[in-house]
């Protein structure tokens, strides 16, 4: 029996008893549990407000995938969508979806660089003429940052915290650099003392978190540099002019744009509503199901 899906299920994560199990169907941007992924898609379909719509079960579906995905992983995404009831399925690489989602004309001959930092992967791509010219994909994203924070809390404060608490810390006081304008107030974090086993709280500030996630942010920067090194000169000129666009939930980390800009010596800007960029772009692709040449 499925009790909850999405946010409601996430609220239960780490709090369940033996008769309830929370499952994360996707890991590192790909399907980790085929059956759970199929159920999740089915439940999401049920959430669609079908008002003023003739209910038609021959669904068309567009799904975002990491650009570094294997053929087998791609097939798994395709199959799970079909098992959930989709009749026509197309896949879109997430950097392409992110570009569409922030309003870039991806069919134009001007090159644009997208850095999409999702939950399981970071995608860096140079896009022009409806294609991905140069791309790098690493299986590092928001989840890895949460793990860094959990690890730091264990080492620095002898405090064991759950994944959801780490996510809240990242959102409330997360920063990519210690020196930021308008720093957030320190927050109180509750967890379990590793030595005594008793619940305890500590205060955590943005400087601590900047230190905790520093190595992972450096890996993301290295990936951006690697993609720039593989970009043709004509497109490099476009990127110099247009800058680099950041999308994805973890791009909202305070000071990340400034840190990346000082490392690559290019203008770095946050895309509009970066958290929903890929979802919005996938929606644009769905409306152009048979028009866009880059849908797989």
Task: Give the role of each language-model region.
Residues 1-117, 125-245, 251-296:
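Nucleotide/phosphate-binding catalytic cleft detector across ATP-hydrolyzing
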């Amino acid at each position: 029996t499925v009790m909850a899906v999405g946010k409601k299920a996430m609220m239960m994560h780490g709090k369940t008893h033996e008769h309830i199990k929370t499952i994360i169907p996707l890991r590192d941007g790909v399907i980790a549990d085929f059956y759970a992924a199929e159920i999740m898609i089915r439940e999401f379909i049920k959430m669609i407000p079908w008002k003023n719509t003739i209910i038609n079960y021959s669904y068309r579906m567009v799904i975002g995938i990491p650009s570094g995905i294997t053929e087998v992983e791609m097939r798994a995404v395709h199959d799970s969508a079909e098992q959930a009831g989709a009749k026509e399925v197309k896949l879109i690489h997430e950097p392409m979806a992110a570009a569409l989602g922030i309003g870039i004309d991806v069919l134009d001959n001007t090159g644009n660089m997208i850095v999409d930092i999702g939950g399981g992967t970071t995608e860096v791509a140079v896009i022009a003429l409806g294609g991905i010219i140069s791309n790098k994909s690493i299986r590092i994203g928001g989840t890895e940052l949460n793990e860094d924070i959990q690890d730091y809390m264990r080492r620095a404060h002898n405090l064991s915290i759950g994944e959801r608490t780490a996510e809240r810390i990242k959102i409330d006081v997360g920063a990519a650099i210690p020196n930021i304008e308008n720093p957030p107030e320190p927050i109180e974090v509750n967890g379990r003392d590793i030595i005594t086993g008793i619940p305890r709280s500590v205060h955590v500030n943005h400087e601590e978190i900047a230190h905790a996630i520093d190595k992972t942010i450096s890996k993301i920067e290295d990936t951006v540099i690697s993609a720039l090194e593989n970009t043709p000169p004509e497109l490099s000129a476009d990127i110099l002019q247009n800058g680099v666009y950041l999308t994805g939930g973890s791009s909202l980390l305070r000071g990340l744009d400034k840190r990346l800009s000082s490392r690559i010596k290019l203008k770095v800007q946050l895309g509009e509503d970066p958290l929903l960029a890929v979802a919005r772009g996938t929606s644009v692709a769905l409306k152009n199901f048979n028009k866009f040449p880059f849908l797989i």
